[in-house]
């Protein structure tokens, strides 16, 4: 039985240790190996609750992603072939408000001063503004997730899949009408 010795550190330079581990993972293709060595095993599929790419990542994202990564690594240690699917949340009021501010328009101007198609095109571009920063964070924190083929919530395939699933839930009687208090923004005209 062979013995392996862990590297000993005299001083605690966590940034240096992190760089060394990331380099070792890159050299050994560790993330890919964690998948290929489990071909044929039971699968566990993880869809990341996607971050919004139109905002910069913060410490709360690091904390949430750490928990997500722990779950996936735990399932990997249990012998599962873990598929980790990244995604981008591209819907929402912050995207629209940011584009309107950048263009100097209001909701009422959409369809008159700017076509709906042009507005949507600009929103799609702007929502992906910080993807490079997110991808750097993903790598630097050692978060293992497949960023090569993310699901994107503005993609028609994604939207049609949700419509299909909602229709299936409706057919099975699993949707119901209810009443809740909703936040309202007078400035954005939402509610």
Placement of each model-derived feature along the sequence:
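N-terminal, positively charged nucleic-acid-binding surface of large information/translation enzymes
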Residues: 2-191
């Amino acid at each position: 039985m062979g013995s392996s010795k862990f590297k000993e550190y005299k001083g605690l330079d966590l940034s240096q240790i992190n760089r060394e581990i990331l380099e070792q993972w890159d050299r050994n293709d560790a993330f890919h190996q964690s998948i290929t060595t489990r071909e044929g095993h039971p699968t566990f599929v993880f869809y990341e609750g996607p971050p919004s790419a139109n905002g910069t990542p913060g410490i709360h994202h690091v904390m949430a992603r750490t928990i997500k990564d722990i779950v996936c690594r735990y399932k990997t240690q249990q012998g599962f072939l873990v598929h980790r699917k990244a995604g981008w949340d591209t819907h929402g009021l912050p995207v629209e408000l940011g584009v309107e501010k950048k263009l100097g328009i209001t909701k009422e101007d959409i369809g008159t001063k700017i076509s709906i198609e042009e507005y949507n095109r600009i929103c799609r571009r702007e929502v992906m503004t910080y993807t490079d920063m997110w991808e750097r964070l993903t790598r630097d924190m050692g978060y293992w997730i497949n960023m090569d083929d993310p699901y994107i919530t503005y993609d028609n395939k994604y939207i049609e899949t949700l419509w299909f699933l909602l229709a299936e839930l409706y057919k099975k009687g699993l949707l119901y009408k209810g009443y809740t208090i909703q936040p309202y923004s007078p400035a954005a005209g939402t509610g």
